Amino acid sequence: GMARLNRPSIFVYGGTILPGENHTDIVSVFEAVGSYVAGDIPITQLEHIEKTAIPGAGSCGGMYTANTLASAIEALGMSMPNSSAQNAVSDNKKQDCIDAGKAIVYLLEHDIKPSDIKTKKAFENAITLIITLGGSTNAVLHLIAMADTIGVEVTLDDFVRIGEKTPVIADLRPSGKYLMSELIEIGGIQPLM
């Protein structure tokens, strides 16, 4: 939407969910359902996991589509620094909203549009970050579509080229061990950029 309109704009991400009891998340619920169906846990345990794994507001706690794309948008330069790595329910997220308000005033005053920010190099930075984070493969479709909308050529070949020289260094769920909230604790994505 921002690229199609090409008006000064900034993305404000809602933030990630805090972990549930005993380091649980949405995947814990899926696994518990499977365990219950297999007869490995009683219904009371399944219900307890369902009630405690998702403690409040925010996107899924791992490097799923929402956190992946929020990180990519930050790397593109379309959101505030470190805004993709904030818990939904936090003072940092409130401050991010205030900072975004100040930033949009600057963008409007200087007529800085998405087409000025979303360059080929910006998309390459976003792709590099997503690969480093082990982000969702949905980023491929979304970033190609975003680039096309703004008139920048990004193809699957760009992902392959960048991926061949970029290691995955984050160990984030769903395939890894850690949650986004733990990446936040060590500084978010800024140290990676």
Show the residue positions of the predicted features.
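Phosphate-handling active-site elements
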Residues: P8-F11, I150-D158
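Phosphate/diphosphate-binding loops
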Residues: G1, E47-K51, D158-M193
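Acidic, glycine-rich active-site loops and adjacent beta-strand->loop/helix elements
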Residues: Y13-P19, A53, M146-D148, V160-I169
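Alpha-helical support elements that line or immediately flank enzyme active sites
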Residues: L141-V152
